[in-house]
């Protein structure tokens, strides 16, 4: 029996058309909501779903590309305090974390999801490039300038 999957399962992804045993389809897949019977009406419903998903995918990609441009135009500036000990070693107090990067981006009206920036702890002076995951394969490179203020 041919069925159209309505959810991802071990037999395939959502909206896939598969062939399974009649009993499996009638007694498990269809009653549990994992599939619907293959028919012209259900095929039209599937095509409509696929076109809606395609439009949604396109919209998300375009928003991610706009956000990518905004992020790549930015250069965030942070200052950390440091001290020099008796042996002339530099000790930086603290670091710039992922949370601080997100807070600074919010000041520029850029809101990211929780896992967009991998765990970052910057404590070395200079310019750093942090990769930001926006959507599937779309990533932005955020420039972070870190200045260390040495106190004696």
UniProtKB/Swiss-Prot annotation:
Keywords: Ribonucleoprotein, Ribosomal protein, RNA-binding, rRNA-binding. One of its GO terms (cellular component) is ribonucleoprotein complex. The keyword Lipid biosynthesis does not apply. Gene3D superfamilies: Ribosomal protein L9, C-terminal domain, Ribosomal protein L9, N-terminal domain. GO terms for molecular function: rRNA binding; structural constituent of ribosome. The keyword Ribosomal protein applies. HAMAP family: Ribosomal_bL9. Belongs to the bacterial ribosomal protein bL9 family. This is Large ribosomal subunit protein bL9. It comes from Mycoplasmopsis synoviae (strain 53).
């Amino acid at each position: 029996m041919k069925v159209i999957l309505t959810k991802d399962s071990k037999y395939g992804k959502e909206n896939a058309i598969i062939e399974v045993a009649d009993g499996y389809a009638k007694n498990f897949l269809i009653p549990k909501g994992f599939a619907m019977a293959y028919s012209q009406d259900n095929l039209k419903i599937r095509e409509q779903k696929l076109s809606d998903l395609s439009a949604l995918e396109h919209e998300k990609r375009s928003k991610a590309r706009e956000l990518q441009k905004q992020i790549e135009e930015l250069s965030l500036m942070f200052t950390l305090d440091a001290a020099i000990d008796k042996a002339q070693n530099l000790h930086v107090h603290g670091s710039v974390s992922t949370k601080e990067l997100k807070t600074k981006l919010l000041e520029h009206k850029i809101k990211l999801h929780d896992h967009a920036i991998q765990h970052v702890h910057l404590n070395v002076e200079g310019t750093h490039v942090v990769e930001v995951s926006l959507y599937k394969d779309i990533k932005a490179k955020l420039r972070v300038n870190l200045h260390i203020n040495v106190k004696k």
